[in-house]
């Protein structure tokens, strides 16, 4: 159901956007999405998560979000069929893009699903859990732009490798900081340090899907950008299905800190595979491919907001054909 909501919302945005403002619309959409994701966690403080009221509140807010679309008198957007790329074609175009998208889906699903579980096991209060999730989302939104700018200047694979190893290092540091939380109150390390390293981790990790998408676009023609994005989203979803399950195994084997150990392990896999791909394949300079910040929940309809994709066929005003017809008549009269 959430996928349907994303698809409808992004199709409306795409239909109402022009070739001049698609990038701006996508940026605003991404900031709102991450911001709402972070702010939404504070709703847990209004009622105990063990009660049914939070679920009712989420249902009401979700329904209210659709009211502007339901009340509009404008014609709904039409869906056009996208010529999909097979997974084989996608892998041949960008092995690193496809493989890293799968593992990053595993990371993201575990991160947003089990972060609250980890924080609860570390004796965080509900308000502190809200702060943790808020910092994670906001830091991820802010990091998109500087990281994306750097990726347009250098080999994107190098930027991805540095980002993944950076996230892995900060995940390990978060383990060392969190272990101090079990000490008596007088000796306990302030949770502020945990917040700081979580922000740094998010800064390195959350721009990853946009980087992967931009890297894949470097190796394909412009007319296949949307199809490739849809394929990467599918592979991302396959990885996401296994993320929470695998992470829970790590946490069951080594305790709560298995959460960050899991994040360290899978970020390292992406980084190592990126180094391998840099040795076997040279980078290319595709002028049609540039970094555009995108959330990992983006749908094919939303990918069309990417200003690097094919231009939107904007409607021609009715006055133009009338004028073009009237001009020959005037000439004949003269």
Question: Language-model segments: what does each one mean?
Answer:
Residues 4-17, 206-220:
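Intracellular juxtamembrane helix-capping segments at the cytosolic ends
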Residues 19-29, 126-127, 220-232:
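Loop-to-transmembrane helix entry/capping segments in MFS-fold secondary transporters
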Residues 44-45, 59-79, 270-278:
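C-terminal membrane-cytosol helix-exit motif in multi-pass small-molecule transporters
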Residues 79-84, 277-334:
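Intrinsic disorder in cytosolic terminal tails and internal cytosolic loops
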Residues 166-186:
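C-terminal ends and interior cores of transmembrane alpha-helices
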């Amino acid at each position: 159901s959430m996928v349907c909501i994303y698809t409808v919302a992004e199709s409306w945005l795409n239909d109402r956007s022009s070739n001049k403002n698609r990038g701006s619309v996508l940026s605003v959409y991404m900031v709102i999405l991450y911001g709402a994701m972070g702010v939404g966690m504070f709703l847990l403080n209004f009622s105990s998560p063990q009660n049914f009221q939070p679920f009712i509140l989420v249902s009401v807010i979700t329904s209210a979000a659709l009211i502007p679309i339901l009340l509009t008198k404008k014609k709904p957007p039409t869906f056009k069929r996208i010529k999909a790329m097979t997974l084989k074609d996608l892998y041949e175009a960008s092995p690193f893009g496809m493989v890293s998208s799968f593992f990053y889906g595993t990371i993201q699903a575990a991160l947003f699903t089990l972060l609250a579980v980890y924080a609860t096991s570390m004796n965080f209060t509900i308000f502190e859990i809200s702060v943790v999730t808020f910092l994670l989302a906001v830091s991820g939104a802010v990091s998109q732009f500087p990281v994306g700018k750097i990726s347009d200047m250098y080999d994107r694979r190098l930027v991805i490798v540095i980002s993944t190893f950076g996230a892995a290092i900060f995940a390990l540091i978060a383990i060392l900081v969190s272990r101090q939380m079990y000490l008596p109150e007088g000796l306990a390390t302030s949770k502020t340090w945990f917040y700081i390293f979580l922000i740094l981790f998010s800064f390195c990790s959350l721009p990853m899907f946009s980087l992967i998408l931009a890297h894949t676009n470097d190796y394909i023609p412009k007319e296949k950008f949307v199809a490739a994005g849809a394929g990467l989203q599918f592979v991302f979803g396959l990885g996401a299905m296994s993320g929470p399950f695998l992470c829970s195994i790590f946490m069951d084997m080594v305790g709560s800190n298995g959460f960050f150990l899991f994040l360290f392990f899978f970020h390292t896999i992406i980084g190592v595979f990126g180094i391998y791909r840099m040795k076997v394949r040279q980078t290319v300079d595709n002028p049609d491919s540039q970094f555009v910040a995108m959330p990992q929940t983006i749908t094919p309809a939303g990918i069309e907001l990417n200003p690097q994709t094919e231009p939107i066929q904007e409607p021609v005003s009715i006055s133009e054909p009338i004028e073009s017809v009237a001009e020959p008549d005037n000439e004949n009269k003269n």
